[in-house]
């Protein structure tokens, strides 16, 4: 690892650091003496020590902060302790009724740039830990971190996910944020064999997960609880599932007794996976319609034809990759929400 450097702030720019915001943009820095990708001590304009993090000269977010304890070295013990804290925090949560979960969520767990999702296959009881190194600071120490993860993430550490045998680690560092960090994508096995398509459980339902080429790390784990919540409103309902991906909301809705589900997505392959998920759960295929196409255009067509639904699910992708795209993204989110509301029956 590169030696510790320093990043001195411009006068009056220390407030966000004191308030423990994890990012420092280039405009806040007066002078940096550090190696690209190396660790830095962040100093106020008058030289006071404020925090410690890692540095990327090519990113708009030039320093990502890790600790506000001057006596805390950024060694392997630090990273292990942060991982253990993240996993332990999830252990205290109520039962998940799922065999997959995000166990490390970057800044939210004090580990900016590191994501780790665990999928336990319900058939073989083998597990795949899908990891993402999204920042340069994680990239330069990825080997150490990837060796630590299987030591921390064990069946005993997260009993809510059940037991598993062999654990493979697979890297899906292909998010757009790597390009913003000046890095190319990387998708490859870290340890263990190349994973096959998995089948995970969620609230008693089975879902196909392609960790090699599916969206994100294979499944939208952030919507896991929401899929069950939405299903409570779907009994006897006609449901529109826009941006359906592999049909998670639709499968939950049909299990809850929806009269019909219309899955709309741009990806024909994702819709095909949704069809397989339906069959995997012995749900009636005749109550599901799938439409491959531009979601905005499809919803406008439904609006113009006067088609209405009792429940409309909108789970669009990220529309803005940077601040220059925010205005256009805002229009996109406004348009899709207005379209969704126009397709709701009164009381829907």
Give the predicted meaning of each segment.
Residues 76, 138-142, 146, 223, ...:
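Short, charged, low-complexity patches
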Residues 64-74, 129-142:
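Short histidine-centered catalytic/ligand-binding loop motif
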């Amino acid at each position: 690892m590169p030696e510790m450097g320093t990043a001195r702030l411009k006068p009056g720019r220390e407030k966000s650091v004191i308030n423990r915001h994890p990012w420092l943009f280039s405009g806040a820095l007066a002078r940096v003496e550090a190696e690209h990708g190396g660790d830095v001590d962040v100093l106020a304009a008058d030289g006071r020590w404020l925090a410690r993090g890692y540095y990327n000269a090519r990113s708009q977010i030039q320093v990502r902060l890790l600790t506000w304890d001057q006596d805390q070295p950024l060694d392997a013990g630090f990273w292990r302790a942060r991982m253990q804290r993240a996993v332990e925090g999830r252990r205290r949560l109520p039962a998940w009724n799922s065999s997959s979960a995000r166990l490390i969520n970057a800044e939210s767990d004090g580990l900016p740039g590191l994501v780790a999702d665990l999928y336990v296959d319900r058939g073989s009881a083998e597990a795949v830990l899908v990891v993402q190194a999204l920042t340069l600071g994680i990239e330069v120490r990825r080997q150490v971190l990837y060796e630590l993860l299987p030591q921390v993430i064990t069946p005993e550490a997260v009993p809510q996910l059940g037991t598993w045998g062999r654990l493979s680690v697979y890297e899906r560092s292909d998010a757009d944020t790597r390009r913003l960090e000046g890095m190319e994508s990387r998708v490859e096995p870290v340890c263990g064999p190349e994973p096959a398509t998995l089948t995970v459980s969620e609230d008693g339902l089975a879902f196909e997960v392609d960790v090699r080429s599916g969206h994100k790390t294979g499944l939208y784990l952030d919507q896991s609880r929401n899929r069950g919540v939405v299903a409570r409103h779907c009994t006897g309902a006609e449901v529109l599932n826009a941006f359906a991906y592999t049909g998670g909301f639709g499968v939950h809705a049909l299990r809850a007794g929806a009269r019909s589900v219309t899955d709309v997505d741009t990806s024909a392959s994702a819709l095909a996976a949704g069809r397989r998920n339906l069959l995997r759960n012995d749900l009636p295929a005749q109550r599901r319609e799938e439409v491959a196409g531009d979601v905005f255009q499809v919803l406008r067509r439904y609006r113009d034809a006067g088609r209405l639904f009792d429940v409309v699910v909108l789970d669009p992708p990220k529309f803005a990759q940077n601040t220059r795209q925010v205005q256009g993204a805002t229009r996109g989110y406004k348009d899709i929400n207005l379209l969704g509301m126009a397709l709701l029956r009164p009381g829907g």
